[in-house]
């Protein structure tokens, strides 16, 4: 390749990167120092394949703390009567890999991440753990570049809807306990959890299936066995609750139909008696 062609290719790549960063910054609402944003988007698989570049792991560590602080402060102020244990469970319902990944998907964050070929080939751009880690790294980058107030504003914008939804649904409670109470009410038996783990020791991913009466009603993934089981319990709770609501709705409609039919029959009988 000639030097001119190489220069043209490099310039085109740089222009595409800059355009991509501008798009992401528009979604975030902040313009960040270029090198800092690049680092926040650099997964270690890309760094290792390109000569040991800096990864986003330190920024992820920082962003995790910023996210935790802002969410904890919000919960503390909005739920003055909740004890520490329930506040912790509410926070866990918001700050977990699945919730972070969903927020990341809303930003289409996966399309901006710098991934190695191996991760790229195995669907890494939509992998919950990678999306969650990258989102935390981006929050860390906003904190370093713009300060705590800006990072806090970003966290509020992205996570306040989740906090409100979780509070309204009672997600601050223990999902495993909620599932056990629901299955007892529905006469389904006691839930059990089958957990598998994948990945190296320093980065394990746990997958849990919530089973009741031999039937799997929900699955979940997380960085710990506890998180995976909670996610699976939530998924199963929603599935069983939805099915129960549908049955109740069908029963109510059937009862209404029967009542209307009985009313019509009575009306016909009354009309017959009157004509006689």
Curated annotation (Swiss-Prot):
Digests double-stranded RNA. Involved in the processing of primary rRNA transcript to yield the immediate precursors to the large and small rRNAs (23S and 16S). Processes some mRNAs, and tRNAs when they are encoded in the rRNA operon. Processes pre-crRNA and tracrRNA of type II CRISPR loci if present in the organism. Its EC number is 3.1.26.3. Pfam families: dsrm, Ribonucleas_3_3. It is found in: Cytoplasm. Residues 230-242, 250-276 have a biased composition (Low complexity). It comes from Streptomyces avermitilis (strain ATCC 31267 / DSM 46492 / JCM 5070 / NBRC 14893 / NCIMB 12804 / NRRL 8165 / MA-4680). SUPFAM superfamilies: dsRNA-binding domain-like (SSF54768), RNase III domain-like (SSF69065). It catalyses: Endonucleolytic cleavage to 5'-phosphomonoester. Belongs to the ribonuclease III family. GO terms for cellular component: cytoplasm. It is an enzyme of class 3 (hydrolase). Homodimer. One of its GO terms (molecular function) is rRNA binding. The active site is at residues 64, 136. SMART domains: DSRM, RIBOc. Its main location: cytoplasm. This is Ribonuclease 3. Residues 174-242 form the DRBM domain. Gene3D superfamilies: 3.30.160.20, Ribonuclease III domain. Residues 217-276 are annotated as: Disordered. One of its GO terms (biological process) is tRNA processing. Its cofactor is Mg(2+). Residues 19-147 form the RNase III domain.
């Amino acid at each position: 390749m000639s030097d001119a062609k190489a220069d043209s290719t490099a310039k085109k790549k740089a222009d595409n990167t800059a355009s991509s960063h501008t798009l992401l910054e528009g979604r975030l609402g902040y313009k960040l120092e270029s090198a800092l944003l690049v680092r926040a988007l650099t997964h270690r698989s890309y760094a290792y394949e390109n000569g040991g570049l800096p990864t986003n792991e330190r920024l992820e560590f920082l962003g995790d703390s910023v996210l935790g602080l802002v969410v904890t402060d919000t919960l503390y102020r909005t739920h003055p009567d909740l004890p520490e244990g329930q506040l912790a469970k509410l926070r866990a319902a918001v700050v977990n890999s699945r919730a972070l990944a969903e927020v990341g998907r809303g930003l289409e964050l996966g399309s901006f991440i710098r991934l190695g070929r191996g991760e790229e080939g195995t669907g890494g751009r939509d992998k919950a753990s990678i999306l969650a880690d990258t989102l935390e790294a981006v929050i860390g980058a906003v904190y370093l570049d713009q300060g705590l107030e800006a990072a806090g504003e970003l966290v509020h914008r992205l996570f306040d809807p989740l906090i409100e939804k979780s509070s309204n649904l009672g997600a601050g409670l223990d999902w495993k306990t909620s599932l056990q109470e629901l299955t007892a009410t529905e006469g389904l038996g006691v839930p059990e959890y089958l957990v598998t783990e994948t990945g190296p020791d320093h980065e394990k991913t746990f997958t849990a299936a919530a089973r009741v009466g031999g039937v799997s009603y929900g699955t979940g993934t997380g960085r710990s066995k506890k998180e995976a089981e909670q996610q699976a319990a939530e998924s199963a709770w929603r599935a069983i609750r939805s099915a129960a609501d549908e049955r109740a709705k069908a029963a109510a409609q059937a009862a209404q139909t029967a009542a209307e039919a009985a009313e019509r029959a009575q009306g016909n009988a009354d009309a017959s008696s009157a004509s006689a």
